[in-house]
UniProtKB/Swiss-Prot annotation:
Principal EC category: ligase
Pfam families noted in UniProt: tRNA-synt_2, tRNA_anti-codon
Entry EC no(s): 6.1.1.6
GO BP annotations, alphabetical order: lysyl-tRNA aminoacylation
Protein's name in the database: Lysine--tRNA ligase
Necessary cofactors: Mg(2+)
PROSITE patterns reported in the protein's UniProt record: AA_TRNA_LIGASE_II
Record text on cofactor binding: Binds 3 Mg(2+) ions per subunit.
Annotated organism of origin: Shewanella woodyi (strain ATCC 51908 / MS32)
GO molecular function terms noted in the UniProt entry: ATP binding; lysine-tRNA ligase activity; magnesium ion binding; tRNA binding
Binding site for Mg(2+) 1: 411, 418
Residues annotated as transmembrane: none
Length: 501
Protein backbone atom coordinates (compact mmCIF):
# COMPACT_ATOMS: atom_id res chain seq x y z
CA UNK A 1 0.00 0.00 0.00
CA UNK A 2 1.41 3.40 -0.93
CA UNK A 3 0.43 6.72 0.57
CA UNK A 4 -2.28 8.33 -1.53
CA UNK A 5 -2.02 12.08 -2.13
CA UNK A 6 -5.07 13.46 -3.90
CA UNK A 7 -4.71 16.19 -6.55
CA UNK A 8 -6.38 18.74 -4.26
CA UNK A 9 -3.95 17.81 -1.51
CA UNK A 10 -1.01 18.25 -3.88
CA UNK A 11 -2.29 21.72 -4.65
CA UNK A 12 -2.58 22.58 -0.96
CA UNK A 13 0.94 21.32 -0.28
CA UNK A 14 2.29 23.45 -3.13
CA UNK A 15 0.49 26.51 -1.78
CA UNK A 16 1.91 25.94 1.68
CA UNK A 17 5.42 25.49 0.33
CA UNK A 18 5.08 28.82 -1.46
CA UNK A 19 4.00 30.42 1.81
CA UNK A 20 7.03 28.94 3.55
CA UNK A 21 9.34 30.41 0.94
CA UNK A 22 7.78 33.81 1.59
CA UNK A 23 8.21 33.30 5.34
CA UNK A 24 11.86 32.25 4.97
CA UNK A 25 12.55 35.43 2.98
CA UNK A 26 10.78 37.80 5.37
CA UNK A 27 11.05 36.30 8.85
CA UNK A 28 14.00 35.59 11.16
CA UNK A 29 15.38 32.13 11.95
CA UNK A 30 14.64 30.92 8.42
CA UNK A 31 10.98 30.81 9.37
CA UNK A 32 11.55 28.41 12.28
CA UNK A 33 12.08 30.49 15.46
CA UNK A 34 12.99 28.76 18.68
CA UNK A 35 12.69 31.56 21.21
CA UNK A 36 9.01 31.56 22.21
CA UNK A 37 8.44 31.01 25.93
CA UNK A 38 5.21 29.03 26.37
CA UNK A 39 4.25 29.64 30.00
CA UNK A 40 0.74 28.26 30.22
CA UNK A 41 -1.19 25.21 29.06
CA UNK A 42 -4.72 25.25 27.72
CA UNK A 43 -6.18 22.91 30.33
CA UNK A 44 -4.65 24.85 33.22
CA UNK A 45 -6.15 28.09 31.91
CA UNK A 46 -9.55 26.45 31.44
CA UNK A 47 -9.45 24.99 34.94
CA UNK A 48 -8.39 28.24 36.61
CA UNK A 49 -10.60 30.72 34.78
CA UNK A 50 -13.36 28.66 33.17
CA UNK A 51 -15.93 29.70 35.77
CA UNK A 52 -15.21 33.43 35.69
CA UNK A 53 -17.63 35.85 34.06
CA UNK A 54 -16.69 38.09 31.17
CA UNK A 55 -16.74 41.11 33.44
CA UNK A 56 -14.55 39.45 36.05
CA UNK A 57 -11.91 38.57 33.46
CA UNK A 58 -11.93 42.08 32.02
CA UNK A 59 -11.23 43.49 35.45
CA UNK A 60 -8.49 40.99 36.25
CA UNK A 61 -6.33 41.79 33.23
CA UNK A 62 -4.86 38.28 33.08
CA UNK A 63 -1.96 37.81 30.63
CA UNK A 64 -1.27 34.34 29.27
CA UNK A 65 1.30 32.85 26.86
CA UNK A 66 0.14 29.77 24.95
CA UNK A 67 1.52 27.70 22.10
CA UNK A 68 0.18 24.86 20.04
CA UNK A 69 -1.26 23.68 16.76
CA UNK A 70 -4.10 25.44 14.94
CA UNK A 71 -6.93 22.91 14.74
CA UNK A 72 -9.72 25.12 13.44
CA UNK A 73 -10.41 28.65 12.21
CA UNK A 74 -13.70 30.28 13.19
CA UNK A 75 -13.78 33.77 11.78
CA UNK A 76 -11.26 35.78 13.81
CA UNK A 77 -10.82 32.91 16.30
CA UNK A 78 -8.15 30.22 16.08
CA UNK A 79 -8.55 26.97 18.03
CA UNK A 80 -5.15 26.13 19.52
CA UNK A 81 -4.38 22.60 20.71
CA UNK A 82 -1.53 21.69 23.04
CA UNK A 83 -0.78 18.50 24.94
CA UNK A 84 -3.33 19.34 27.63
CA UNK A 85 -6.31 20.45 25.56
CA UNK A 86 -7.64 23.36 23.53
CA UNK A 87 -8.13 27.11 23.89
CA UNK A 88 -8.90 29.89 21.43
CA UNK A 89 -6.83 32.83 20.25
CA UNK A 90 -8.39 35.99 18.84
CA UNK A 91 -6.97 37.86 15.85
CA UNK A 92 -8.35 41.38 15.49
CA UNK A 93 -8.51 43.08 12.09
CA UNK A 94 -5.06 44.65 12.41
CA UNK A 95 -3.59 41.33 13.48
CA UNK A 96 -5.26 39.58 10.56
CA UNK A 97 -3.72 42.08 8.16
CA UNK A 98 -0.28 41.51 9.66
CA UNK A 99 -0.69 37.73 9.52
CA UNK A 100 -1.56 38.02 5.86
CA UNK A 101 1.40 40.27 5.08
CA UNK A 102 3.98 38.42 7.16
CA UNK A 103 2.92 34.80 6.74
CA UNK A 104 0.44 34.99 3.86
CA UNK A 105 -2.12 33.85 6.39
CA UNK A 106 -2.17 30.95 8.82
CA UNK A 107 -3.34 27.43 7.97
CA UNK A 108 -4.85 24.63 10.00
CA UNK A 109 -1.95 22.55 11.28
CA UNK A 110 0.44 25.50 11.75
CA UNK A 111 2.09 25.78 15.16
CA UNK A 112 1.98 29.24 16.73
CA UNK A 113 2.79 31.01 19.97
CA UNK A 114 0.48 33.70 21.35
CA UNK A 115 0.74 36.11 24.28
CA UNK A 116 -2.06 38.41 25.36
CA UNK A 117 -4.92 39.18 27.71
CA UNK A 118 -7.43 36.49 28.59
CA UNK A 119 -11.06 37.16 27.71
CA UNK A 120 -14.40 35.38 27.49
CA UNK A 121 -16.24 35.32 24.16
CA UNK A 122 -19.92 35.96 23.70
CA UNK A 123 -20.42 32.19 23.42
CA UNK A 124 -18.71 31.65 26.76
CA UNK A 125 -15.34 30.41 25.46
CA UNK A 126 -12.03 31.56 26.90
CA UNK A 127 -9.61 33.11 24.44
CA UNK A 128 -6.23 34.83 24.44
CA UNK A 129 -6.05 38.10 22.52
CA UNK A 130 -3.21 37.96 19.97
CA UNK A 131 -1.14 40.90 21.23
CA UNK A 132 2.17 39.14 20.56
CA UNK A 133 2.45 36.15 18.26
CA UNK A 134 4.91 34.02 16.33
CA UNK A 135 4.54 31.39 13.65
CA UNK A 136 6.76 28.69 15.10
CA UNK A 137 6.35 25.95 12.47
CA UNK A 138 4.66 26.07 9.09
CA UNK A 139 2.77 22.83 8.41
CA UNK A 140 3.31 21.83 4.79
CA UNK A 141 0.76 19.03 4.76
CA UNK A 142 -2.92 19.60 5.58
CA UNK A 143 -4.60 17.66 8.34
CA UNK A 144 -7.70 15.59 7.61
CA UNK A 145 -10.61 18.00 7.87
CA UNK A 146 -12.41 15.48 10.02
CA UNK A 147 -10.83 12.44 11.54
CA UNK A 148 -13.90 10.50 10.43
CA UNK A 149 -12.48 10.90 6.94
CA UNK A 150 -9.34 8.98 7.90
CA UNK A 151 -11.03 5.60 8.02
CA UNK A 152 -8.09 3.45 6.93
CA UNK A 153 -6.81 1.82 10.12
CA UNK A 154 -3.42 1.18 8.53
CA UNK A 155 -3.00 4.90 7.92
CA UNK A 156 -3.70 5.54 11.59
CA UNK A 157 -0.97 3.11 12.60
CA UNK A 158 1.57 4.06 9.93
CA UNK A 159 1.06 7.79 10.51
CA UNK A 160 0.56 7.73 14.25
CA UNK A 161 1.62 11.37 14.40
CA UNK A 162 -1.49 12.34 12.43
CA UNK A 163 -3.62 10.02 14.53
CA UNK A 164 -2.37 11.68 17.73
CA UNK A 165 -2.93 15.19 16.38
CA UNK A 166 -6.54 14.69 15.39
CA UNK A 167 -7.83 11.79 17.49
CA UNK A 168 -8.43 12.60 21.15
CA UNK A 169 -9.32 8.99 21.97
CA UNK A 170 -5.95 7.86 20.68
CA UNK A 171 -4.11 10.49 22.71
CA UNK A 172 -6.03 9.51 25.82
CA UNK A 173 -5.21 5.83 25.31
CA UNK A 174 -1.48 6.51 25.34
CA UNK A 175 -1.78 8.88 28.28
CA UNK A 176 -3.53 6.06 30.14
CA UNK A 177 -0.78 3.66 29.09
CA UNK A 178 1.83 5.92 30.66
CA UNK A 179 -0.23 6.17 33.84
CA UNK A 180 -0.65 2.39 34.04
CA UNK A 181 3.10 1.80 33.73
CA UNK A 182 3.85 4.48 36.34
CA UNK A 183 1.24 3.07 38.73
CA UNK A 184 2.65 -0.45 38.40
CA UNK A 185 6.18 0.83 38.97
CA UNK A 186 5.11 2.76 42.07
CA UNK A 187 3.21 -0.25 43.42
CA UNK A 188 6.23 -2.51 43.03
CA UNK A 189 8.60 -0.03 44.66
CA UNK A 190 6.22 0.32 47.63
CA UNK A 191 6.31 -3.47 47.95
CA UNK A 192 10.13 -3.22 48.25
CA UNK A 193 10.95 -4.59 44.81
CA UNK A 194 14.11 -3.29 43.16
CA UNK A 195 13.88 -2.27 39.51
CA UNK A 196 16.67 -3.74 37.38
CA UNK A 197 17.72 -4.00 33.75
CA UNK A 198 18.83 -7.24 32.16
CA UNK A 199 20.27 -7.93 28.68
CA UNK A 200 18.15 -7.40 25.58
CA UNK A 201 20.49 -9.55 23.47
CA UNK A 202 21.04 -13.14 24.56
CA UNK A 203 23.54 -15.70 23.39
CA UNK A 204 20.98 -18.36 24.34
CA UNK A 205 17.29 -17.42 24.12
CA UNK A 206 15.28 -18.58 27.10
CA UNK A 207 12.62 -17.83 29.67
CA UNK A 208 9.65 -18.59 27.41
CA UNK A 209 8.47 -20.90 24.68
CA UNK A 210 8.73 -18.76 21.55
CA UNK A 211 10.65 -18.34 18.31
CA UNK A 212 13.37 -15.69 18.69
CA UNK A 213 14.73 -13.03 16.36
CA UNK A 214 18.32 -13.86 15.45
CA UNK A 215 21.16 -11.47 14.67
CA UNK A 216 24.95 -11.66 14.52
CA UNK A 217 27.54 -9.96 16.69
CA UNK A 218 30.35 -9.08 14.30
CA UNK A 219 33.11 -8.45 16.84
CA UNK A 220 32.44 -11.68 18.75
CA UNK A 221 31.43 -13.58 15.61
CA UNK A 222 28.55 -15.28 17.39
CA UNK A 223 24.82 -15.57 16.90
CA UNK A 224 22.77 -13.38 19.22
CA UNK A 225 19.06 -13.37 19.90
CA UNK A 226 16.69 -10.59 20.88
CA UNK A 227 15.28 -11.65 24.18
CA UNK A 228 11.99 -13.48 24.33
CA UNK A 229 11.85 -13.05 28.12
CA UNK A 230 14.11 -11.76 30.92
CA UNK A 231 13.23 -14.61 33.27
CA UNK A 232 16.50 -16.52 33.51
CA UNK A 233 18.55 -13.38 34.12
CA UNK A 234 16.14 -12.11 36.77
CA UNK A 235 16.33 -15.44 38.60
CA UNK A 236 20.12 -15.27 38.46
CA UNK A 237 19.75 -12.03 40.42
CA UNK A 238 17.65 -13.80 43.05
CA UNK A 239 20.41 -16.41 43.31
CA UNK A 240 22.78 -13.50 43.84
CA UNK A 241 20.78 -12.22 46.81
CA UNK A 242 18.42 -9.61 45.37
CA UNK A 243 15.27 -11.12 46.84
CA UNK A 244 12.69 -8.90 45.11
CA UNK A 245 13.36 -7.66 41.58
CA UNK A 246 11.27 -6.42 38.69
CA UNK A 247 11.82 -5.17 35.16
CA UNK A 248 9.54 -3.28 32.76
CA UNK A 249 10.89 -3.66 29.27
CA UNK A 250 10.47 -5.05 25.77
CA UNK A 251 10.38 -8.67 24.69
CA UNK A 252 10.70 -9.81 21.07
CA UNK A 253 9.11 -12.88 19.52
CA UNK A 254 9.42 -13.80 15.87
CA UNK A 255 5.80 -14.73 15.45
CA UNK A 256 2.65 -13.58 13.67
CA UNK A 257 0.60 -10.41 13.92
CA UNK A 258 -2.90 -10.46 15.39
CA UNK A 259 -5.21 -8.29 17.51
CA UNK A 260 -3.38 -9.78 20.52
CA UNK A 261 0.17 -10.11 19.22
CA UNK A 262 2.93 -7.74 18.15
CA UNK A 263 6.50 -8.97 17.56
CA UNK A 264 7.81 -6.54 20.18
CA UNK A 265 5.78 -5.97 23.30
CA UNK A 266 6.17 -4.72 26.86
CA UNK A 267 6.24 -6.94 29.93
CA UNK A 268 6.54 -6.31 33.62
CA UNK A 269 8.30 -9.33 35.06
CA UNK A 270 9.06 -9.76 38.75
CA UNK A 271 10.45 -12.33 41.17
CA UNK A 272 10.11 -12.61 44.94
CA UNK A 273 12.03 -15.01 47.17
CA UNK A 274 10.32 -16.99 49.91
CA UNK A 275 6.96 -16.89 48.15
CA UNK A 276 4.85 -19.25 46.06
CA UNK A 277 2.31 -18.92 43.27
CA UNK A 278 -0.52 -18.30 45.73
CA UNK A 279 1.32 -15.21 46.96
CA UNK A 280 1.58 -14.04 43.35
CA UNK A 281 -2.14 -14.35 42.83
CA UNK A 282 -2.82 -12.37 46.00
CA UNK A 283 -0.34 -9.68 44.95
CA UNK A 284 -1.86 -9.48 41.46
CA UNK A 285 -5.34 -8.96 42.90
CA UNK A 286 -4.08 -6.19 45.16
CA UNK A 287 -2.11 -4.52 42.37
CA UNK A 288 -4.84 -4.46 39.74
CA UNK A 289 -7.61 -3.50 42.14
CA UNK A 290 -5.61 -0.57 43.51
CA UNK A 291 -4.42 0.61 40.08
CA UNK A 292 -7.93 0.51 38.58
CA UNK A 293 -9.32 2.51 41.50
CA UNK A 294 -6.42 4.98 41.41
CA UNK A 295 -6.55 5.64 37.66
CA UNK A 296 -10.24 5.19 36.87
CA UNK A 297 -11.96 5.95 40.16
CA UNK A 298 -13.51 2.50 40.34
CA UNK A 299 -12.40 -1.14 40.11
CA UNK A 300 -15.21 -1.73 37.62
CA UNK A 301 -14.24 -0.86 34.05
CA UNK A 302 -16.25 -1.14 30.81
CA UNK A 303 -14.84 -3.50 28.22
CA UNK A 304 -16.89 -3.90 25.07
CA UNK A 305 -20.31 -5.16 26.08
CA UNK A 306 -19.01 -6.27 29.47
CA UNK A 307 -18.01 -4.68 32.76
CA UNK A 308 -14.75 -6.07 34.11
CA UNK A 309 -14.53 -6.05 37.90
CA UNK A 310 -10.95 -5.68 39.11
CA UNK A 311 -12.11 -5.46 42.72
CA UNK A 312 -11.63 -9.15 43.55
CA UNK A 313 -11.53 -11.76 44.78
CA UNK A 314 -10.71 -13.29 41.41
CA UNK A 315 -11.90 -16.73 40.37
CA UNK A 316 -9.35 -19.54 40.60
CA UNK A 317 -9.81 -22.90 38.90
CA UNK A 318 -7.63 -25.52 37.28
CA UNK A 319 -7.24 -25.85 33.53
CA UNK A 320 -8.99 -29.22 33.62
CA UNK A 321 -11.90 -27.81 35.64
CA UNK A 322 -12.18 -24.84 33.28
CA UNK A 323 -12.43 -27.17 30.28
CA UNK A 324 -15.18 -29.09 32.05
CA UNK A 325 -17.01 -25.90 33.06
CA UNK A 326 -17.22 -24.60 29.52
CA UNK A 327 -18.02 -27.95 27.87
CA UNK A 328 -21.00 -29.05 29.97
CA UNK A 329 -22.57 -31.17 27.24
CA UNK A 330 -19.46 -33.14 26.28
CA UNK A 331 -19.66 -36.41 28.20
CA UNK A 332 -16.05 -37.38 27.42
CA UNK A 333 -14.76 -34.12 28.86
CA UNK A 334 -17.05 -34.26 31.89
CA UNK A 335 -15.68 -37.66 32.91
CA UNK A 336 -12.05 -36.90 31.98
CA UNK A 337 -9.40 -37.58 34.65
CA UNK A 338 -5.71 -36.70 34.89
CA UNK A 339 -4.90 -40.33 34.11
CA UNK A 340 -6.68 -39.92 30.77
CA UNK A 341 -5.00 -36.56 30.19
CA UNK A 342 -1.66 -38.40 30.45
CA UNK A 343 -2.73 -40.70 27.57
CA UNK A 344 -1.56 -38.95 24.40
CA UNK A 345 -3.78 -41.04 22.10
CA UNK A 346 -6.84 -40.22 24.21
CA UNK A 347 -5.98 -36.53 24.07
CA UNK A 348 -5.39 -36.60 20.32
CA UNK A 349 -8.73 -38.28 19.72
CA UNK A 350 -10.47 -35.75 21.96
CA UNK A 351 -8.87 -32.82 20.14
CA UNK A 352 -9.86 -34.26 16.76
CA UNK A 353 -13.43 -34.79 17.98
CA UNK A 354 -13.53 -31.06 18.72
CA UNK A 355 -12.54 -30.28 15.13
CA UNK A 356 -9.02 -29.22 16.03
CA UNK A 357 -5.96 -29.56 13.82
CA UNK A 358 -3.08 -30.96 15.85
CA UNK A 359 0.68 -31.19 15.45
CA UNK A 360 2.43 -34.56 15.62
CA UNK A 361 4.91 -33.35 18.25
CA UNK A 362 2.28 -32.08 20.70
CA UNK A 363 2.57 -33.64 24.12
CA UNK A 364 -0.31 -34.44 26.47
CA UNK A 365 0.15 -31.09 28.17
CA UNK A 366 0.18 -29.21 24.89
CA UNK A 367 -3.00 -30.97 23.81
CA UNK A 368 -4.69 -30.06 27.10
CA UNK A 369 -3.66 -26.43 26.71
CA UNK A 370 -4.85 -26.31 23.11
CA UNK A 371 -8.22 -27.78 24.07
CA UNK A 372 -8.49 -25.17 26.83
CA UNK A 373 -7.66 -22.43 24.35
CA UNK A 374 -10.17 -23.74 21.83
CA UNK A 375 -13.11 -24.24 24.18
CA UNK A 376 -12.69 -22.20 27.37
CA UNK A 377 -10.25 -19.29 27.11
CA UNK A 378 -12.52 -16.82 25.33
CA UNK A 379 -15.21 -17.37 27.99
CA UNK A 380 -13.04 -15.91 30.75
CA UNK A 381 -14.27 -12.31 30.71
CA UNK A 382 -13.86 -11.63 34.42
CA UNK A 383 -10.42 -11.79 36.10
CA UNK A 384 -9.62 -15.49 36.46
CA UNK A 385 -6.54 -17.45 37.51
CA UNK A 386 -6.22 -20.75 35.64
CA UNK A 387 -3.98 -23.18 37.53
CA UNK A 388 -2.85 -26.76 37.05
CA UNK A 389 -0.63 -26.30 34.00
CA UNK A 390 1.08 -29.55 32.95
CA UNK A 391 4.80 -29.84 33.61
CA UNK A 392 5.64 -30.65 29.99
CA UNK A 393 4.53 -27.15 28.92
CA UNK A 394 5.96 -25.47 32.02
CA UNK A 395 9.68 -26.26 31.89
CA UNK A 396 10.66 -23.57 34.42
CA UNK A 397 7.87 -24.12 36.96
CA UNK A 398 7.95 -26.16 40.17
CA UNK A 399 6.03 -29.44 40.11
CA UNK A 400 2.96 -29.69 42.29
CA UNK A 401 3.63 -31.71 45.44
CA UNK A 402 0.42 -33.74 45.15
CA UNK A 403 0.26 -34.23 41.38
CA UNK A 404 3.60 -34.31 39.57
CA UNK A 405 1.92 -34.13 36.17
CA UNK A 406 1.06 -30.48 36.82
CA UNK A 407 2.98 -27.51 38.21
CA UNK A 408 2.33 -24.71 40.67
CA UNK A 409 1.65 -22.37 37.79
CA UNK A 410 -1.19 -20.11 36.72
CA UNK A 411 -2.10 -17.93 33.81
CA UNK A 412 -4.29 -14.92 34.43
CA UNK A 413 -7.14 -14.15 32.03
CA UNK A 414 -9.36 -11.12 31.58
CA UNK A 415 -11.58 -10.24 28.66
CA UNK A 416 -11.09 -13.67 27.13
CA UNK A 417 -7.32 -13.39 26.78
CA UNK A 418 -4.19 -14.15 28.78
CA UNK A 419 -2.73 -11.13 30.56
CA UNK A 420 -0.18 -12.72 32.92
CA UNK A 421 1.74 -15.91 33.61
CA UNK A 422 3.23 -16.85 36.97
CA UNK A 423 4.46 -19.80 38.97
CA UNK A 424 6.47 -21.13 41.84
CA UNK A 425 9.93 -21.34 40.35
CA UNK A 426 11.69 -24.62 39.74
CA UNK A 427 14.77 -24.40 41.96
CA UNK A 428 15.82 -28.05 41.71
CA UNK A 429 18.89 -27.88 39.46
CA UNK A 430 18.75 -31.56 38.49
CA UNK A 431 15.04 -31.44 37.60
CA UNK A 432 15.68 -28.27 35.57
CA UNK A 433 18.52 -30.01 33.74
CA UNK A 434 16.22 -32.87 32.77
CA UNK A 435 13.47 -30.51 31.62
CA UNK A 436 15.86 -28.51 29.47
CA UNK A 437 16.93 -31.79 27.84
CA UNK A 438 13.28 -32.65 27.17
CA UNK A 439 12.88 -29.24 25.52
CA UNK A 440 15.86 -29.97 23.28
CA UNK A 441 14.22 -33.25 22.26
CA UNK A 442 11.00 -31.37 21.49
CA UNK A 443 12.90 -28.87 19.35
CA UNK A 444 14.53 -31.75 17.46
CA UNK A 445 11.05 -33.19 16.89
CA UNK A 446 9.90 -30.01 15.16
CA UNK A 447 8.73 -27.68 17.94
CA UNK A 448 10.30 -24.34 16.96
CA UNK A 449 9.12 -22.74 20.20
CA UNK A 450 10.77 -25.24 22.54
CA UNK A 451 13.49 -23.86 24.80
CA UNK A 452 17.24 -24.08 24.37
CA UNK A 453 19.49 -25.72 26.94
CA UNK A 454 21.13 -23.04 29.12
CA UNK A 455 24.12 -24.53 30.95
CA UNK A 456 25.01 -21.31 32.77
CA UNK A 457 21.51 -21.09 34.23
CA UNK A 458 21.90 -24.64 35.54
CA UNK A 459 25.19 -23.56 37.12
CA UNK A 460 23.38 -20.65 38.77
CA UNK A 461 20.73 -22.99 40.19
CA UNK A 462 23.48 -25.25 41.52
CA UNK A 463 24.57 -22.32 43.70
CA UNK A 464 21.09 -22.36 45.24
CA UNK A 465 17.91 -20.48 44.31
CA UNK A 466 15.72 -19.91 47.39
CA UNK A 467 12.04 -20.79 47.16
CA UNK A 468 10.87 -18.17 44.68
CA UNK A 469 7.79 -17.14 42.76
CA UNK A 470 7.80 -15.09 39.56
CA UNK A 471 5.33 -13.57 37.16
CA UNK A 472 5.14 -11.69 33.88
CA UNK A 473 2.32 -9.26 33.12
CA UNK A 474 1.64 -8.15 29.55
CA UNK A 475 1.49 -4.37 29.73
CA UNK A 476 -0.03 -3.95 26.26
CA UNK A 477 -2.91 -6.34 26.92
CA UNK A 478 -3.52 -4.79 30.34
CA UNK A 479 -3.68 -1.32 28.80
CA UNK A 480 -6.19 -2.63 26.25
CA UNK A 481 -8.48 -3.39 29.18
CA UNK A 482 -7.94 -0.01 30.83
CA UNK A 483 -8.66 1.82 27.56
CA UNK A 484 -11.51 -0.40 26.31
CA UNK A 485 -9.69 -1.17 23.07
CA UNK A 486 -9.70 -4.49 21.27
CA UNK A 487 -6.55 -4.60 19.18
CA UNK A 488 -3.02 -4.35 20.50
CA UNK A 489 -2.14 -1.89 17.74
CA UNK A 490 -4.31 0.71 19.43
CA UNK A 491 -2.09 0.72 22.53
CA UNK A 492 1.35 0.45 20.87
CA UNK A 493 2.50 3.77 19.48
CA UNK A 494 4.26 2.32 16.44
CA UNK A 495 3.08 -1.27 15.91
CA UNK A 496 4.72 -3.63 13.44
CA UNK A 497 3.21 -3.30 9.97
CA UNK A 498 3.52 -5.25 6.78
CA UNK A 499 5.66 -3.46 4.17
CA UNK A 500 3.84 -1.09 1.87
CA UNK A 501 3.57 -2.27 -1.73
Amino acid sequence: MTEQVLPDENKLIAERRAKLEHIRANCPANGHPNNFDRKHKAADIQAEFGNNTKEELEGMGIQRSIAGRIMAKRGPFLVIQDVSGRIQAYAGKDVQKDLKATFQGLDIGDIIGVTGQLHLSGKGDLYVNMEEYQLLTKALRPLPEKFHGLTDQETRYRQRYVDLIVNEDSRNAFIMRSKVVSAIRNFMVKKEFMEVETPMMHSIPGGASARPFETHHNALDIAMYLRIAPELYLKRLVVGGFERVFEINRNFRNEGLSPRHNPEFTMMEFYMAYADFNDLMDLTEEMLSSIATELCGSPQLPYGEHTVDFGGPYARLSMLDAIKKYNPDNATIQSMTYEEVKDVEFMRDLAKSLGMTIEKFWTCGQLLEEIFGETAETQLMQPTFITGYPADISPLARRNDDNHFITDRFEFFIGGREVANGFSELNDAEDQDNRFKAQVDAKDAGDDEAMFYDADYITALEHGLPPTAGQGIGIDRLVMLFTNTHTIRDVILFPAMRPQA
